[in-house]
Amino acid sequence: MVDHYQVLGVTRNATKKEVKDAFRRLAIKYHPDKHAQSPEHVRHNATVRFKLVSEAYEVLNDDLKRASYNAGSDSDCFRRTSGSYSNPYGNRGGRAQGSGYGYGYGYSTRNRQASSFSSGFDSTFRYLTTRAFLLNLALAGGLYFAFTAIDTSGETLWKMRNSGKSFEEAMESIEKSKSHKDEG
């Protein structure tokens, strides 16, 4: 994990102004347009560092993102101080597999396709277990039960009061009685 404070060269308690000043200084230093005429490896390193600086600024300049980053990075303290060195820029001298960049975000299309099913399943499962979905499901179940109970009780009441007759037969007898009244 890249330490955004290290990337910008500021302390953890740096103000927004200090973060902004550090970003501007490093953005000018590593901007890809400034290195357009440089050799390939210099351009590549400048582009990678510019992206890291931009990402660090985006996180540290927003109060919510910064608080979230600080909370997450405090729990990663053991990983950062474990004694093994990791290159904060992630480039390993070549390009990352499957992407056009060399800053560690490479992926192969086979892995992406294989994980698309599981991520689709995960997102569907997360949606199905949200409180709003479960409340809507309970409401729909309650309405279904109520309508079924009303329909069943209506049929039961009809059969109790009109034994041996169906609704259609009752309607026919009403029609016959109306026609007898009209004739007579």
UniProtKB/Swiss-Prot annotation:
Keyword Chaperone: yes
Membrane spanning stretches: 133-150
Keyword Transmembrane helix: yes
Keyword set, alphabetical order: Chaperone, Membrane, Transmembrane, Transmembrane helix
Pfam family, one: DnaJ
Entry membrane topology: Single-pass membrane protein
CDD domains, per database record: DnaJ (cd06257)
Major location (coarse): membrane
Alphabetical list of PROSITE patterns matching this protein: DNAJ_1 (PS00636), DNAJ_2 (PS50076)
Family: Belongs to the DnaJ family. C/III subfamily.
Protein role: Plays a continuous role in plant development probably in the structural organization of compartments.
Record protein name field: Chaperone protein dnaJ 72
Gene this protein is translated from: ATJ72
